[in-house]
Amino acid sequence: LAKEGKPVLSVNAAMNELAAQGVTDLKIQSLHIAPAEEYNQLERMVVKNITKNPGVFKTVKVGYPLLVSEKDLDAVVKVVLASLPKDRKPGDAVVLMGHGNDRGPGDLTLAATAAAFHKADPHVWLATVEGSNSFDNVLPKLKASGAKRVWLQPFMIVAGDHANNDLAGPEEDSWASRIKAAGMTPMPNLKG
């Protein structure tokens, strides 16, 4: 929206604007993948606004992130695997890049998601920019897999800076550069 010259309101400002318009029943939907720090910040902002403005809203509900149940996990794994590049050949590996979080339930959720992807397809790994499921842990597994080509795809709602730089950028510490240095061919697919 900001690129189109439209203002992007903070959660607090958006809630105040909706209250000024007479909205009394409010539903806020998270666009986060896992219940991590940014989702927790959203919840805190909503609670802070409600506390400062008691009685303004009759009801306020905050929707959960994408992955909060085993059913969600199964559905996401199925959809993401179906969306992998059609040019992928047998034996090609895939590394999905999640944002991650270095603590709390978000890290655990993404670890479970990584295990579910790998169980569904042994040539698919999920690694995160932050948190315990780092690319450093995945790279030796890629080497051991014998894959010649490694597809790189973001596991993010918006494939922005992390995908363009950390995943597929030309810097020597990008995942693509590290895969190339390990003797494999990186195949970036930058759709989120």
Where do the protein language model's features map onto the residues?
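Active-site-proximal alpha-helix that buttresses catalytic centers in soluble enzyme cores
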Residues: 1-192
